[in-house]
């Protein structure tokens, strides 16, 4: 059953939405509906601190104090045939990113460094529509090599999959599969035209049926309306993923979204809290774009406003916060790292 299955959808009337959320989400464990999330997103900025405090209470009650740390690595960079308008790895745009592949020894070394940071999850990513036989063989070899030398969970993000490929990855022992819906179904055609939102959903359904954990989130600040952001939260709640990574658009030169403005920090924090109230039991991960959108102070507020997982180090084509900075912040906030056994 997804977190949206039994939630009410009626309007609340004149009752304060945070009072409703305290009763419904914090005390009752039921995520907010689409209409309720929209009310949260429309709250004035002077309610932000109250909103973040409630989202933190919800996270602590339904997820606990632990924070999961993950590192990611690009096995194949650039040259992607898809036209995701935010992505500098598309071969269709005049971006500075060039196609490259990582060798297995470098992959193993990256996994070792990730584990040293305290991370329990190592995600192997490839810029493709979906994996071909050559890439799957390389992934299989990489997973085996990492397993021989590093104690860490292995996740993959390899685009859209066939049923056979899903089974192959499950047999390789992939712990979690990431495939982001990216945005609301109604806004998706403004972001991608070379495949559909439904194709992504189908891959996620097969991943769940195969017994792997589902990781699915998206990018906020791509021009979607608040209504569409609330729609996206409700769609994720219907899917019921184990993890939702929240990215914020970091406009990349040469892409169709390269000239968009960065989301205001207050709007980003409000969105983090709203997604926590829609998904009270889900792992909510700070992902790409938080550095440019929120800065150091915003990162702290986000972790105290519903976030319970982070990506440490760099992202696929952009720089992230140093792992030490995130780990020091978590230590200062007295938030323990999730151990490997708890992640298995």
UniProtKB/Swiss-Prot annotation:
The keyword 4Fe-4S applies. Keywords: 2Fe-2S, 4Fe-4S, Biotin biosynthesis, Iron, Iron-sulfur, Metal-binding, S-adenosyl-L-methionine, Transferase. One of its GO terms (molecular function) is 4 iron, 4 sulfur cluster binding. InterPro entries: Aldolase_TIM, BATS_dom, Biotin_synth/BioAB, Biotin_synthase, Elp3/MiaA/NifB-like_rSAM, rSAM. Its cofactor is [4Fe-4S] cluster; [2Fe-2S] cluster. The keyword Plastid does not apply. It catalyses: (4R,5S)-dethiobiotin + (sulfur carrier)-SH + 2 reduced [2Fe-2S]-[ferredoxin] + 2 S-adenosyl-L-methionine = (sulfur carrier)-H + biotin + 2 5'-deoxyadenosine + 2 L-methionine + 2 oxidized [2Fe-2S]-[ferredoxin]. It is an enzyme of class 2 (transferase). [2Fe-2S] cluster binds at residues 123, 156, 215, 285. Binds 1 [4Fe-4S] cluster. The cluster is coordinated with 3 cysteines and an exchangeable S-adenosyl-L-methionine. Binds 1 [2Fe-2S] cluster. The cluster is coordinated with 3 cysteines and 1 arginine. Residues 65-290 form the Radical SAM core domain. Its EC number is 2.8.1.6. Catalyzes the conversion of dethiobiotin (DTB) to biotin by the insertion of a sulfur atom into dethiobiotin via a radical-based mechanism. HAMAP family: BioB. Homodimer. Belongs to the radical SAM superfamily. Biotin synthase family. This is Biotin synthase. It comes from Mycolicibacterium paratuberculosis (strain ATCC BAA-968 / K-10) (Mycobacterium paratuberculosis).
């Amino acid at each position: 059953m997804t977190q949206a299955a039994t939630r009410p959808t009626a309007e609340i009337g004149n009752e304060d939405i945070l009072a409703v959320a305290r009763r419904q989400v914090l005390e009752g464990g039921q995520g907010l509906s689409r209409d309720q999330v929209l009310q949260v997103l429309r709250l004035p900025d002077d309610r932000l601190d109250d909103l973040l405090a409630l989202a933190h209470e919800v996270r602590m009650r339904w997820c606990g104090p632990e924070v999961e740390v993950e590192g990611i690595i690009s096995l194949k960079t650039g040259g992607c045939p898809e036209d995701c308008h935010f992505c500098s790895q598309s071969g269709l745009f005049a971006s500075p990113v060039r196609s490259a592949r990582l060798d297995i020894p470098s992959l193993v070394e990256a996994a070792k460094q990730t584990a040293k940071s305290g991370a329990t999850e190592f995600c192997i990513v490839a810029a493709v529509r979906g994996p071909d036989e050559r890439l799957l063989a390389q992934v299989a070899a990489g997973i085996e090599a990492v397993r021989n030398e590093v104690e860490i969970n292995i996740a993959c993000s390899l685009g859209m999959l066939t049923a056979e490929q899903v089974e192959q990855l499950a047999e390789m022992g992939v712990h979690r599969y990431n495939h982001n819906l990216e945005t609301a179904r109604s806004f998706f055609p403004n972001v991608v035209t070379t495949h559909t939102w439904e194709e992504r959903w189908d891959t996620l359904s097969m991943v769940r049926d195969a017994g792997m954990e589902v990781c699915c989130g998206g990018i906020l600040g791509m021009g979607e309306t608040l209504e569409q952001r609330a729609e996206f939260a409700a769609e994720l709640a219907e899917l019921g993923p184990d993890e939702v990574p929240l990215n914020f658009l970091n406009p990349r030169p040469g892409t169709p979204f390269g000239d968009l403005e960065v989301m205001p920090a207050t709007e980003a924090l409000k969105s983090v809290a709203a997604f926590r109230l829609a998904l009270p039991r889900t792992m909510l991960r700070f992902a790409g774009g938080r550095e440019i959108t929120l800065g150091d102070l915003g990162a702290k507020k986000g972790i105290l406003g519903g976030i319970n997982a982070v990506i440490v180090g760099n992202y696929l084509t952009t720089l992230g916060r140093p792992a030490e900075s995130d780990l020091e912040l978590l230590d200062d906030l007295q938030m323990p790292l999730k151990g490997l056994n708890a992640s298995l």
